[in-house]
Each structure stands twice: as structure tokens, then as C-alpha cells.
């Protein structure tokens, strides 16, 4: 008799995705982040659902409802901090996942890669709208500054901003719609994740060598299920430690001050995971130019497959490209640091230099070094 997991209409989908899936035998821990992102998404949806039961999306009561959750709801403080720091873990895993894709040439699976970019944008939009909901000072001013960037779009900009705001400033209508979209988007993200996996399973996984591994495959279960569970334990330990020992480490103290449209905070900045893009935005002294650079800093990922000119897929055997990759990582850390600093000397020039380097490495230096390595292969 055939096993039910191979015949049942629903179980056979799960079976072919997580049990009998042929996987390359050489996958390293860098391949753990996909499953970790799945866990993060699950944690965020669950904690978010319970938070939404007690939250009120009204400017008069939003801040107090969050305080009420932390003080009066059973384990409300735990839910709130799991959700806030869960977002940080989500982005750590997300950036490591994208970095893995860049390093090992996974972007040559163009459908999977493009859905991934779409997912990145969707998660960033969700996180931005979620940050507005507690209605603290940084929530209000962050929403005002970032939505106002759309006014840089010629002709329709101002109308577009007022349409998003639902009025002439960030107010009750804005908060209500942001809550609605913040609730809706994670489910759209979940659907996109399924499409992401669908396209991935069409081609099979890449591996660290970048060499086709069709002749050396192992079943996903038990080998990679056990490996993934170890990843879950490490990540959940890190998240628990952050939540239970220093829950406000990654937050902004200004967000404990209720939103006040008459009082601007000295330094308006987004959460840490957007600081690199914020630094690129600020480094250009023109509004429209800054907005374009901001969008391009993420959208540039879409042209990475076109810029791949190397004869080898992975960077595993390309030491020169490896040096450039780690320089890019250093530039991103620098941008993240600069994004949190005030706009004054010497931070301005450091930010501008790092922004130029960021685009220079991806657009010019990486392809140039790849061509050099191709030439060296002939020796």
C-alpha cells in the first residue's frame, strides 16, 4: 500500500515540498534563513493578531491602548515586545538571506529572485506602517517625513500625498488606514512566500559551489528538517533574550512620548533596519534625486542577474569578488551607522561617500572584477 502522504491531495503537496524534496547534500547554514523567515512571519502574524484584539486605531486612544496592552493585558508586554523585536529578527534574517543569494549566485533563478524582491518591498511597507501604529513622536514624524517624500513626484506628488494621508496632514484617517493595511499585508506576504517556494521548487535549490548537484541529492526530511529545527532554536533563543533582557535596545526612546504635531523631535529617524536606505536618501541634496536613490537602493537587486558576467555562479572560488562583496557589507554597515547620526560634518560626507561606493560596487566594480576573473581562468 502506498503511503498516505504520497496519495492524499493535500498531504502530497506538503510531502513534495518538505519531506521527499530532493535537496543538494552540501547546503550550509546560510540556507537556513528561508525557514527562519517562515518562523518569523508566523510569530509576527500570531503576536500581531493578539495585539490587534486590544489595539485601537484612533489618534486619541492609540498610544494609551498600547500602554494598556503592556500594563493590563495578561502577558501583553510579552506580545508587544515579541512583535517589535520579532520585526528586527525578521529583517536580520531577510538581509542575511538576500546576502546569501548575492554571494552564491542564487539570483540566476530569476523568477524566485524577482518574487523575493517583491517580498522585500512588501515586508518593508508592512514594517513602516506598523511603526506608525503606537502613535508616539517617532511614529508620527516618521510617517510625516516618509509619506511626504512622494510629493517629490512631478505633477501628481502633492495630490498623491494628501490622498494617502486622507487629509492635509497625518491624522486619524492616516492611522486607521495604516492599521488596515498593516493587518492585510502579512497575508499577502504569506501568499507571495508560497509563490516564491513554487518557483524555487521548479528549479531546485542552488548550493555553495554553484555547480549543478543533480547527481548528489538527499531527501529534505530528516536531514534538513533537523538542521532547520536547530536554526529555529538558535533564533528563538536570541529573540527571547532580546525580549526578556533588553526589549527597548533597538527601539527609539522618543516613541514613548505621545505624538505631538506641534513639537518636532531633534533627530527624526526610522527603525534601524531602514537606516541604510535613509542614509542614501539624505546624502543627495535634491528631494526627487534622494527619493529615486532610495528606491534604487533596493530595486538595484532586480538588475543584479543582468550584471552577472562571471563564468562561475558562486563566489566560493572567486577571491577578488569575495573582497568586493565584504566591502559592500562594510559599506552597508557604514550607511546604517550614518543614518542614525545628525546631518552635520563629518557625517554628511561619510554618508555621501558610502552611498556612491554602494552603487559603484554593484553597478561597475562587481562586473569588472568578474571579467578580470574570467580572464585569469585562462592562465
UniProtKB/Swiss-Prot annotation:
Changing residue 190 to A: In strain: Isolate MVZ 168867, Isolate MVZ 192681, Isolate ROM 104264, Isolate ROM 104368, Isolate ROM 105930, Isolate TK 14522, Isolate TK 17624, Isolate TK 34552, Isolate TK 34555, Isolate TK 34560, Isolate TK 34836, Isolate TK 34842, Isolate TK 34963, Isolate TK 40043, Isolate TK 40082, Isolate TK 40084, Isolate TK 40095, Isolate TK 40099, Isolate TK 40107, Isolate TK 40111, Isolate TK 40114, Isolate TK 40139, Isolate TK 40314, Isolate TK 40318, Isolate TK 40398, Isolate TK 40399, Isolate TK 40401, Isolate TK 40402, Isolate TK 40403, Isolate TK 40406, Isolate TK 40408, Isolate TK 40409, Isolate TK 40410, Isolate TK 40411, Isolate TK 40414, Isolate TK 104603 and Isolate TK 104630. Keywords: Electron transport, Heme, Iron, Membrane, Metal-binding, Mitochondrion, Mitochondrion inner membrane, Respiratory chain, Transmembrane, Transmembrane helix, Transport, Ubiquinone. A ubiquinone binds at residue 201. The chain crosses the membrane at residues 33-53, 77-98, 113-133, 178-198, 226-246, 288-308, 320-340, 347-367. Heme b b562 binds at residues 83, 182. Changing residue 333 to L: In strain: Isolate TK 40403. It is a multi-pass membrane protein. It is found in: Mitochondrion inner membrane. Its cofactor is heme b. The keyword Endoplasmic reticulum does not apply. It comes from the Eukaryota. Heme 1 (or BL or b562) is low-potential and absorbs at about 562 nm, and heme 2 (or BH or b566) is high-potential and absorbs at about 566 nm. Component of the ubiquinol-cytochrome c reductase complex (complex III or cytochrome b-c1 complex) that is part of the mitochondrial respiratory chain. The b-c1 complex mediates electron transfer from ubiquinol to cytochrome c. Contributes to the generation of a proton gradient across the mitochondrial membrane that is then used for ATP synthesis. This is Cytochrome b. The lineage of its organism: Eukaryota, Metazoa, Chordata, Craniata, Vertebrata.
